[in-house]
Amino acid sequence: MKNYIQKYICKSVALFVGTSLMLTGCSESFLDPDPQTMFEPETVFSTENGIKSVLAICDRQLKRNYVSEDSREMIALPTEYTFSDLMVPSATDKSGLLDNVDNLLRPNSDQTNEKNLGRTNSIYFFWRQNFEGVRNANTILSFIGNVPMDETLKNEYIGRAYFHRAYRYYSLVFQFGHVPLLTKLPEVPKQNYRSTHRDAILKKMVADMEFAVQWVPEQKDMDYVGMVNKGACRMLLSKLYMSIGEFGKAKEQLDILIDKSGYSLMKESFGTFFEGGESVSWPITRNVIWDLHRPENKLIAANKEVIMGMPNRGAAKESFIPMLTMRIMYPFFFDNRIKMPDGKQALFNYTRKDGKYRKEYDYMRGLGRGISTFRTTTFYQDDLWAVNDKMDQTDLRHSAETGNWMHMEKLKCNNPDSEFFGQNIKLYAEDDYYNEKNELVTRKGDLMCSDTIRRWYDVPHYIFCLNDVINQAKETNNGLEGATDGSI
């Protein structure tokens, strides 16, 4: 054993000595950094193409601010809704529902990435996204002074950068209050940021947007859709005026926008008619509100209402960002929490290959397969649409008759195994129900939905309905969700 140990000690020493000799044999220049490329901002942003590249990122971020967080459970837009009177979090299987606002309404409350299924809001996402937008706008403003170009063109770039910065700060101050005001890129690492009063920030943004309104061109004078135009600048300036109490100036800008900028309300149907995912189960009567909210019609010349559009279509490689509105904001009604009086599950998301499939009850394609991360409030469903305490039946934005608005009671049981197959679902049982053994199964007045938070509410279908092109083409698919890869 002793000889065995000595043998391996000798080998180890020899290996160590050999390695040491090899290392000392290398010259110190071997350790000198030799990067193949260097990122030098002064060089990259010294041309118009460099400035264009940053502006393109600003435009894309503006779209991503609401469209997606790369998550199948969460998009940013409903977090804004939850701090209004319109929506509340509704995923009852999560550990929290933003119930402790003092803890959760902070920019650093939840710094996990967007794929964390336990998240209930996008508060940190807004903080990060908005300050990234501020940084990119400041990049343009910091370097454009040394870029050789016509002064008029230079002022257009400055005006668009001002818009992007002002838009982010308009969001930040109303989401978080007093925040740090950054108007240039930091030259050294900095951690001692201090907040600036909200009103001071708003007044600075007003001055910037007054400049932008002068120099940014109208959409009709631009080659591309999706970039900042004069109408968008004027709209943001009017909002900023109102935020500091300058209501007269705000009205002046809005009068110009409405009467002298080529925009007008759409009063008749126009563009392409999308009949919905399944026109038999959920028919749509064509109307101007439905047409106005279709992605196919948003950016066409016939649409006189759009002030600034943000294209989001095609494939992911073309910068398309999925927006699963029908998954995230529609009721989770395809499970056994909603029953018929005989105790059978009321609604199933059958595939078209299933023997129990009936086109007239195909609500999965008509309305999507929701999981209800967020839901509409009672105010949004009812009170908002009342005029003098009476429901306005003529408002197309709340019209169930045209298919624009989804009421749960409009759905019919699509379970062939139920005695109530083809009958409308009800929140409460209308009569006692006895089975074939004369046993009482359901009493009159019993609740037919055991989770009304997540599974029983109305939806503004005309807003959130998106064509799920890829999944719609698959006969075996049972989960339409919204705009997926390849959508318009």
Q: Where does each model-flagged region fall?
A:
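C-terminal motif of bacterial Sec signal peptides marking the signal peptidase cleavage site
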Residues: 23-25
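Bacterial N-terminal signal peptides that target proteins for export
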Residues: 2-13
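Short acidic-aromatic linear motifs embedded in glycine-rich loops, typified by GG[WY][YF]DAGD(H)
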Residues: 27-160, 169-177, 184, 191-192, ...
